[in-house]
Curated annotation (Swiss-Prot):
Subcellular location: Secreted
Tissues showing expression: Expressed by the venom gland.
Pfam families for this protein: Kunitz_BPTI (PF00014)
The UniProt record lists the keyword Signal: yes
Signal peptide (UniProt feature, chain positions): 1-24
Protein name, UniProt field: Protease inhibitor 3
């Protein structure tokens, strides 16, 4: 194999390693709990990457981020596996 092919292979492997998440969970699971801008009091769940658990929080009803699940089952299915 020529050195050009080896260099190309090394580059592709490096790119693949950079694009592959360290864990299998989506990046949204790393976001902090965010209640949003409104003042509703909606029981919701988020994945806490520090405790590695889905935890309850109160969602305000608008805004926030994607780490916001209606049920603990949905949170587990998405972020715990």
């Amino acid at each position: 194999m020529s050195s050009g092919c080896l260099l190309l292979l090394l580059g592709l492997l490096t790119l693949w390693a950079e694009l592959t998440p360290v864990s299998g969970r989506p990046r949204l699971c790393e976001l902090p709990a965010e209640s949003g801008l409104c003042n509703a009091y909606i029981p919701s769940f988020y994945y806490n990457p520090h405790s590695h658990k889905c935890q309850k929080f109160m969602y305000g009803g608008c805004g926030g981020n994607a780490n916001n699940f209606k049920t603990i089952v949905e949170c587990h299915r998405t972020c715990v596996g």
